[in-house]
Structure formats: C-alpha cells, structure tokens
Amino acid sequence: MAILKDTIIRYANARYATASGTSTATAASVSAASCPNLPLLLQKRRAIASAKSKNPNLVKRELQAHHSAISEYNNDQLDHYFRLSHTERPLYNLTNFNSQPQVNPKMRFLIFDFIMYCHTRLNLSTSTLFLTFTILDKYSSRFIIKSYNYQLLSLTALWISSKFWDSKNRMATLKVLQNLCCNQYSIKQFTTMEMHLFKSLDWSICQSATFDSYIDIFLFQSTSPLSPGVVLSAPLEAFIQQKLALLNNAAGTAINKSSSSQGPSLNINEIKLGAIMLCELASFNLELSFKYDRSLIALGAINLIKLSLNYYNSNLWENINLALEENCQDLDIKLSEISNTLLDIAMDQNSFPSSFKSKYLNSNKTSLAKSLLDALQNYCIQLKLEEFYRSQELETMYNTIFAQSFDSDSLTCVYSNATTPKSATVSSAATDYFSDHTHLRRLTKDSISPPFAFTPTSSSSSPSPFNSPYKTSSSMTTPDSASHHSHSGSFSSTQNSFKRSLSIPQNSSIFWPSPLTPTTPSLMSNRKLLQNLSVRSKRLFPVRPMATAHPCSAPTQLKKRSTSSVDCDFNDSSNLKKTR
C-alpha cells in the first residue's frame, strides 16, 4: 500500500513538472513574439511617409486641412508674437555689442557664417538657424564674450536651438558638435556652457519670435485677412495689419490665387523662400539686427520679393519708395529704410557670406534662389533708373521757379544802372545772381536733403523728350550748374525760393552723366555708373582734370618706397632682385 502511494506521488510530480515547463516555454515564446522590431517599424514608417509626401493631391489636401484648422487661432498667434517681440526688444543693444573688448562685427560675421555652414551640413530647420542668431545677439548685448569662447558659445546655441525645433533624429549630438569644432572643446565644456546660457537668459532662451515665424504668419494673413471685429491698439500691430491688408492687392496680383483679369498670381512658396533669403542676409547686417524690429524686417522682405517678382515675371512696376512716402509716418520711413538696405545687400553679391553662396548659389544654373536674386537685382536697377529720371524734372521747372523768385526788385538790384535793357530776362538775372559770390557766404548746411542728384544739361531750352512724368522733385543744383546753364538758356531750380538762403550740399561730388539718349537705359545697367550716382566727396566744386606732361618733357623718376630696403630705382628692371 505504501509502495502504491509513493508511485502515485511521483507520477503527479512528474506531470506537474512537465506542465510547468510547457507553460514557461509558451510564455517565453509569447513574450518574444509580443516585442516588436523597433528599427524595422521605424524604417517602414519612414518609407510610408516618404511615399505619401510624393503624392501631390494628398499634400494639397493636407495643407488645406492645416489651413482651415489654424485659421481660428492665427490672430492669437500673431498677438503672441507681438508680445514676445515687445518683451525681448530691450535685450538687443548695439552700443553694448560695440563695447565688447574682444569681439567685433567682423568676428560676428565669421561666427554667423560658421553657424550657417554647420546648419546647412546638419540639414536642420530654418527656425533653428534664426533662433541661434537670436540667442547670440541677446547674449552679446548683455555679457562680455571672450574670443576663445565665441565658437563654443555659438555651437552651444545651435545645439539648444536644434533640441527645441528639430526632431530627435536630426538633433545635433555632442559628438557631432565636437567634430564640427575639430575636438577643440570637450563634452563637459558644452554642457557647462549650456547651463550658463540658460541661467544668463533667465531660462527663457527659446521664447523668441524668429523671422520665419513672422514670414509664415504674414503670408497666412495675406491670404486670410483679419475679421473686421479684430482691433489692435498698438501702433506697430495696426501698421503691420494695414500693410498686410494691402499686400494681397498691390500691383494687381494675388498670392496663391488663380490668375484673373486684374493680374497674375504669385507662388507663395517663392515669396517665402525669397523672404527667408533676405532675412538670412539681414541677420549678418549689424544695423538691421539691432536697430529694427524683426516683424518690420520680415514684412519688408515679403513686400520687396513680391514687387520684384511682379516686375520680373509680369513687367508690373511699382516704386516701393513712392508707395511708402505717401503716408510719411515713422513706421513707413523705417520700412522704406529696411527695404532699401535689403536691396543694397542683395545687389552686392560679392559681400555675400560664403555659407550663403554654398547654400543657394551652387552649380545649378536654374535654381529658384538664383532667379529670385536676379529679380531683386533687376528691380533695384529699375528703381535707380526711375530715381535718375525723376531728377530730370528739374529741367521743366526752371522758368517757373526763376519767374517766381526774381521779381522786379531783384532785377533792379542786378541791373542797377538806369539803362536796364529790355532784353534782360529772368535767365540773365539768374546768371548774375549766381555770378555774385557773396551769396555763397549765406549757404547753410541745414537744408541739405539727401539723396543729391545732378542733372545733365541740355543744348537747348526745350524740354527733353525723356523727361519724367512726375510733378515734384527734391533735387537741387549748384552755382556751377547755374552758370553752365546760362550759356544754353536753361537753368536748374532749387527746392526753396531764392529769396531765402541757398542750400548747396557741402559733401557731394559733382557728377555730370551723359545726355539722355535712347541707349541710356542700357548704359545705366552698369553697376559702377549706378554707384557713382550716390558717391559723395568733400569737395564743393568739380576737380580740375590732371594736366598731362608735355610729350617732349623728360620722364618723371619715381622714388623708392619708404619701407623698401633695396637701394634701386623702380623704373630700372635690372636692379630688381628676387626676395623671399
């Protein structure tokens, strides 16, 4: 009986052990099957997303859904950007930056160029680049920067910005940052500088409205304007909303709308790319970065790109200066200054940062960025041409101004004798008036109004066929120009009456361009001639041409340089020796 009982217990234990082993193996297999292959799933998810992004209809529907979803909150978002701008505006101080003992504007340009290289190489977002520039400008306005820590500071700012804006797979790692600086800084130095930046900027380092944020919201507002019930009390916000309301109707064009009888449509992606390019160039400019609000710079870039594309693609011309001079407000003046500065920066491609050239001006000859820069250059040339033609309006106002300025008393003063000839006209009176050099003593510098433009003289008193249709002009002439006109019977006019003291620019160069001919517009496309129109010098009267030596005279012997240690004549090539 005991043997039977022992056999039953052993059999039961064996069955229990078999069952427990089977259940354990089953649980292990189930757990192994339940754990997914994360790298494989990530690869599949990216492949699906890449395939969907190539479907234009799906992308268009997604953009429409996004547009309708955020239309309810766009006003709140814009108001949030303005509040951030007002909060961080006092943090930018150009005087403090210029007071840096070891950092100057050239070093800032080089550091920004280096950061843009790193940003392009890592393929980071546009917001990351602008936030990095913002962090560097904020810190340099409040704290002294050592020259040997400037690169560490810039790379740390790029690291923080990438962690804030970019996805985790694109975020710059510490190993990558060390490779970018050739292992000049350790990982501990990067982490220490990161903590120092957060503490120095009160832990609100990323709360900034960047250029691309303003560009996105402005373009969105131009296609979906504010409702009539929204009222903005601040002058800057009201001014920007007014310009955004006019932006979509300027020059008879619309943004992202079908072409109509009023004019063609513009691609919003081209405007965004061009505005971002101008804002990137503006970030390298010290005056624009510290002096003007970022919202105004973004608005000026959008407006400038839109007008340039209108003229480049559809030949629709609109003068940006005339459009802004109509209101004569402070914000209009600032916007005009920003637009002209951006045009000057876009014209000088030789001064572009090397990182900007490698990013946009690559070997591809048909890139969109190059066409946008060509549009800006054509617009700038046409703008300077129109300003040049506007200066020709002085010739049509000669007789009117002199007839109002020289009355009978002035004529009696000029012709003091009793036998004043009847043929004495206003032109002769003006000639004698300018020939009297005592009037030059009353010249004041207060009434000088730049820009100063000189007009070419005409061989006859009839108006030129190339006169501008404009009715006003702010240009002035000099006594030399008046005496020159006395031989041809036509005189230039001034802004004020000649009964007042004359206002002659003291710091301007007298430049007489060639007479207007049908080939003048093609000749004026030369950049050097356009630059010479605005060149100023300290001489009041034109410099006499240098007298050439007589052909029979002996050649002039050149003296050796003061820094030269070789006792030889530079005209004699036999005395020259090779030096290291």
Curated annotation (Swiss-Prot):
Residues 454-469 have a biased composition (Low complexity). Pfam families: Cyclin_N. SMART domains: CYCLIN (SM00385). Residues 470-480, 563-580 have a biased composition (Polar residues). Induction: Not significantly cell cycle regulated. Keywords: Cell cycle, Cell division, Cyclin. Belongs to the cyclin family. Essential for the control of the cell cycle at the G1/S (start) transition. CLN3 may be an upstream activator of the G1 cyclins which directly catalyze start. This is G1/S-specific cyclin CLN3. It comes from Saccharomyces cerevisiae (strain ATCC 204508 / S288c). The lineage of its organism: Eukaryota, Fungi, Dikarya, Ascomycota, Saccharomycotina.
